[in-house]
Amino acid sequence: MEKSMWRHPQKMIIFPIFPIAAIWTSLPDSDYVYMCENSTIYGTKFHKRPDSKGKILINDISSCFLSEPMNVSDYDMLFGGIQKNLGPAGLVIAIIRKDLISETVLPGTPTMLRYKTHADKGSMYNTPPTYNIYIVGKVIKWIQSLGGLDKMKKINESKAALLYDYLDKSDMFCGLADKDSRSLMNITFRTGSEALDSAFVKAAGENGIISIKGHRAIGGIRANLYNAMPIEGVQHLVQFMEAFEKSEGQYE
């Protein structure tokens, strides 16, 4: 089945590739370009900074922050939730050029939603969620103990390669994302049959592999390989996929 033709039962088109810079367009009167570097739904990722044609470039890094090194100066603003790789839900990260922090805001903008409010108060305008911040500190020290972001990237590449290599040779499972757009964090795939996808998800759950079902918007199967996932977890998944394929979907 051609990946570009995959559709959810509700007729939602699935995008296996991020658009290349050559086909990007921007409105001449636009103030900025917004991008989401890593798509958890489709399992795709921008692997290099797109050309924003001189516009301010804002990057949502919620699902890939601290998974690999990045040059923050390539962007005018980076932001995202931290709940994928950095700590528990309830905190956000925002890295913004100082000259973009303005006194001028849209009328009616609440004080708490103004970047200047938090910049002026050192991110402590109100009582911060101290326990969440404590956990973030622990996670950062853990990443440093492994060897920092360069080492973290190598670990994540090794984990993803295990699964992608199997998908590339499998006769039953097929990866969704094109090779040049593949995510290290979220790997999406299918069997080509919704019934077989469901059977796989059910059997996986019975064998200690949970939350493997694809996003509700597109269905299928998805493996989330965030920093905290050990390589042994990916090895277990691949071994189970091999057994499931050999059983032709009749795994017991």
What does each of the following model-derived ranges do?
Residues 12-65:
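Active-site phosphate-binding strand-loop segment of PLP-dependent enzymes
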Residues 173-204:
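Conserved PLP-binding catalytic core of the aspartate aminotransferase-like
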Residues 198-207, 236-242:
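Short amphipathic alpha-helices in soluble, non-transmembrane regions
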Residues 215, 219-252:
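PLP-dependent enzyme catalytic core of the Aspartate aminotransferase-like
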Residues 77, 82-164, 178, 247-248:
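Active-site C-terminal subdomain of aminotransferase-like
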Residues 172-176, 208-214:
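A short linear hydrophobic-aromatic micro-motif
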Residues 4-9, 35, 57-61, 78-81, ...:
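General beta-strand structural signal in soluble alpha/beta enzymes
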